Regions:
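A structured, charge-rich N-terminal accessory region that forms the first stable segment of a protein
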Residues: 38-41, 45, 50
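Flexible hinge/switch segments at interdomain interfaces of large molecular machines
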Residues: 31-39
Length: 148
């Protein structure tokens, strides 16, 4: 079906994308605790209402299992705003899952490869397992605008 412009509007066919300001993209690895600190300091905001789309507990558990297996996770994309605050461009489910696990808002279920922690929440883990989670490095791409 061909799209027709609204009455009185002319159809435009841009041939080039115009970039307003240069974008600086930095690829870095940061520990899980970096994200948690930013959330706690309100420098990285998550949707906190019940209406937020969240993964089911078994999917969140499988994601946490990847961390304990030390399997690389896809990049999380953030954009930096003025004042060292950040917006999540891509990866909000992953960040929210890490935070919910840290806050012990769910118990690990249906783990296939990691034994001994199924049925537990973060607060029930020993210090070694807590530190392993907090120190796991996440691939992140940080988008910064022109730093004038």
């Amino acid at each position: 079906m061909k799209m027709r412009p609204l009455k009185g509007l002319q159809e435009k066919n841009p041939t080039d994308v115009i970039v307003k300001d240069p974008i600086n993209i930095t690829e870095i690895k940061v520990p899980v605790k970096w994200f948690l600190e930013k959330i706690e300091n309100k420098e990285l905001l998550l949707c906190r209402t019940e209406k937020c789309n969240i993964w089911p507990p078994d999917k969140m558990s499988r994601f946490i299992e990847l961390i304990y297996l030390n399997i690389p996770i896809d990049h999380i994309y953030l954009s930096e705003r003025k004042g060292r605050n950040y917006d999540i461009m891509s990866g909000v489910h992953m960040v929210r899952t890490m935070y919910h696990f840290y806050e012990s808002k769910f118990f690990l279920t249906k783990l296939e490869h990691v034994y001994g922690i199924s049925g537990l929440a973060y607060f029930q883990l020993g210090n070694n397992l807590r530190n392993k989670f907090l120190d796991y490095k996440i691939n992140m791409k940080l988008f910064r605008g022109n730093q004038k």
